[in-house]
A protein has these predicted regions:
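N-terminal pre-triad scaffold of radical SAM enzymes
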Residues: 37-46, 125-154
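A solvent-exposed, charged loop/short amphipathic helix patch at secondary-structure junctions
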Residues: 157-163
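Short, non-ligating residues that shape and space the ligands of small metal-coordination modules
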Residues: 102-103, 149, 156-157
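Accessory C-terminal segments flanking Radical SAM cores
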Residues: 2-117, 131-134
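A Trp-anchored, charged/polar loop motif used as the substrate-binding/catalytic surface
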Residues: 117-126
Length: 163
C-alpha cells in the first residue's frame, strides 16, 4: 500500500454507520487505538513497537530475533490488542494516556480519527492474514543531519555530541 501525499483529508466514516462495538472503540474507549491492527514501528536496534511513541521499556518484539509475522502475531502484540478490546490500559501506551489526561489530543486519538476506516480489521488479537497497512522501520542510524528533534538512536551525527 502506498500513501497518497496529495490527499488533503483522511477517509471519512460516519459513526452512525458503524456497529455499536465499533462506534464504542473509535469514539468512547479510553484505551483503544487502531495502530496495533495496522501498524508496526521498529528502531535501528531491531526492537519493535506499536508506534513511535510507545514506551521503550516495553518492546513487542525484536526484528533481529523474529520475523515481522512472528512479531505481528506474537504473544506481546496479541495481548496488547486483547487488552485494548477489553478497554484496559496498555503499558506501551502510557504517553497517549498521559497526554489525554492533561486535555491534549493524543496520537491515539489521531490514529483513531485518521485510520478508523480500517475498523473492519479489528476482530481479535491475532491477524492470521498478516496484512500490515503502514509500517515505520528504521534500518540504521546513518544520517548526515543533526536535527534537534532527533538523537543518536536515529542519527549518527548525534553520537559524538552525546558521548
Amino acid at each position: 500500500m502506498s500513501y497518497d501525499y496529495n490527499s488533503s483529508d483522511p477517509i471519512k466514516i460516519k459513526l452512525a454507520d458503524l456497529e455499536a462495538r465499533e462506534r464504542f472503540l473509535l469514539s468512547e474507549s479510553k484505551t483503544f487505538c487502531m495502530y496495533p491492527w495496522i501498524h508496526l514501528h521498529a528502531y535501528p536496534t531491531g526492537e519493535a513497537y506499536p508506534c513511535c511513541l510507545a514506551e521503550m521499556e516495553h518492546p513487542i518484539g525484536n526484528m533481529r530475533d523474529n520475523s515481522l509475522e512472528e512479531i505481528w502475531n506474537g504473544s506481546n502484540y496479541v495481548q496488547m490488542r486483547e487488552r485494548m478490546l477489553a478497554d484496559k490500559p496498555c503499558k506501551e501506551c502510557t504517553r497517549c494516556y498521559e497526554q489525554e489526561a492533561q486535555g491534549f489530543f493524543s496520537m491515539r486519538n489521531s490514529h483513531n480519527k485518521h485510520f478508523g476506516h480500517h475498523i473492519d480489521k479489528v476482530d481479535q488479537g491475532v491477524n492470521p492474514d498478516f496484512k500490515i497497512v503502514y509500517w515505520d522501520i528504521r534500518f540504521s542510524n546513518l544520517c548526515n543531519l543533526k536535527c534537534r528533534s532527533c538523537g543518536d538512536i536515529f542519527s549518527s551525527n548525534w553520537v559524538q555530541e552525546n558521548k
